[in-house]
Each structure stands twice: as C-alpha cells, then as structure tokens.
C-alpha cells in the first residue's frame, strides 16, 4: 500500500481500508456466531468452566463462537491478527487487527438471561474503525464505522 520510505500516518492507514466493508464483515460474522451460541443455549449447556474467579466463566459456546469468528476472519483477511477473549492474541506492529468477545455477558448467557451479545471490531493501529454487536436473544444489531455513524437495527 505504501511506497518505500513513506511512513504513513494512522489517518492515512484508516483511509486505506473500506470501513463500511469492515463493518459489514463484522455484522456478518457476529450474526453467524450469534446463531451458533443461541442454538447451543437452546440445546443446553454442558461445558462450563471458570477462569480467574468463580464468577468469571467460559462455556463451550464461547470457545466455539470464537473459533468460528477466527475461521471466517482468517478466510477474509489471511494473516491479519485476531485478538479474542478466550484465545488471546496480539497485534504486533499495528495495522489492521480484529478484536472479538464471542459472548459478552457469559454469566447472563449461562443463567438463561437474554442480555448478552457477540462483539466483533476492526482496529487500525489499535483504534476501532468498525464493529458490530449482535444480541442473539432479540436479534438486535448494533453497528458502526468510523466517519459513517452508528445504528441499532438500521436506525441511526
């Protein structure tokens, strides 16, 4: 993207990406993962463990959703880092990366409360430029892209 010797600013890097397309990809993959976790919740949870404390839980659905998201993003953006709550990761050197919380609100998910979502964001040099949150229980979708505003269920 950049000629030899040029050191682009973060703003120039933002301009190199179609943030609307990044937003659409975040919506799509978060929607796929939301369907996966809702179906798993309806089938009943069997794989639940704790992380750092008794109230910091992770389910098999968290892991499965993160794997799905990583797989899809890897197909669309080979080699681009994905930083996830369950599997971790890092984005050395900046540039484009994805940040994922496969089930934001796992305790609510575990106890059958509808207040949880799948969160996916694209970042450039650590600054969020596009993202989506899908709430499986209601089907609501929050989405945003830098310079294009934000919406909930299509309403700004």
Tell me what each language-model feature is:
Residues 92-151:
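DPxDG-like acidic metal-binding loop motif
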């Amino acid at each position: 993207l950049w000629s030899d010797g040029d050191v682009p600013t973060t703003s120039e890097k933002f301009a190199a990406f179609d943030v609307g397309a990044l937003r659409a990809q975040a919506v799509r993959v978060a929607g796929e993962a939301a369907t996966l976790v809702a179906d798993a919740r309806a089938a009943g949870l069997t794989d639940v463990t704790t992380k750092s404390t008794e109230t910091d839980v992770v389910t098999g659905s968290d892991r499965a959703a993160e794997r799905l998201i990583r797989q899809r993003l890897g197909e669309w953006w080979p080699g681009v880092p994905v930083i996830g709550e369950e599997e971790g990761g890092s984005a050395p050197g900046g540039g484009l990366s994805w940040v994922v919380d496969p089930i934001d609100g796992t305790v609510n998910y575990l106890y059958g409360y509808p207040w949880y979502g799948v969160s996916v964001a694209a970042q450039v040099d650590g600054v969020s430029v596009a993202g989506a949150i899908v709430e499986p229980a209601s089907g609501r979708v929050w989405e945003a892209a830098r310079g294009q505003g934000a919406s909930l269920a299509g309403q700004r």
